[in-house]
C-alpha cells in the first residue's frame, strides 16, 4: 500500500475497512517501544477503582465466560477472574497496514483505562534492528489501554499477545498450559535463542518467523483464539521483538470498544 492510499485510509476519506483516525487535541504523544506479555491475570482496568464506574474492562472465567462482578479477585491472586481471550490482537479485512490490540500502558488510575493510542513503527528495534523490524516501517498498531503498566516505562506499550510471556505473575497454567516460553518475552524469545544471532539477516528473519509460527500452532493447538493472537506476532508484527514506535493518542475505534 503506498503512502497516499494509506493516508486516505487513515483519515477516513474512503472506507476499505480502516477506521477513521481522530487525534485527541492535547492528547498524549511521544516515542518508545512495544513489548509483549499475556499473564492471564484480571486486567487492571477491570477494577472500578482503577477504571472508574462504567469504564471497566471486561473479565472472564477460566472457561472464558464473562464475569460481571467488578470486585471478583484476580486469578493471579487466587480468584476466578482472568483476561478474556477476546482481547487478543487482530486485524481487520481491507486494512492491511493497521493492527489492533490491547495493552498495558504507562500511568495509573482512571486517566489511562479505556484510552487509545496509534503506534507508528519506525523500522528499528530497541535492542537490535533486523529485517523483522525494518518490515514494520509502514505498519501501525492501534492499542486500547485495558491494563495499567505500573512497571512500564514512559513510551513503552506492553501489548497483550498470547504466548508473549507471562511476566511476574502467571495465571496461565490451567488455561493455556505451561509451555509458554520465556517468562519475559515468551515464545518469540525462545525462538530468538534457538535460531541464534550468527546467521545472516534474511535467514534470521525466515527462521524466526517459521519457529514462532510452529510454536503458536503447537502450543495453542485446540485453542483457536490464543493461536490467532500468537500468530499476530508472527505475521502482522513480523516476529519483531521490541520494535520502536512513535505514538499519539486518538479516539478509540469501535472495533476495540466492542472488545474492551
Regions found by a protein language model. Name each.
Residues 2-3, 7-260:
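Mature exported/compartmentalized surface modules and terminal targeting/interaction regions
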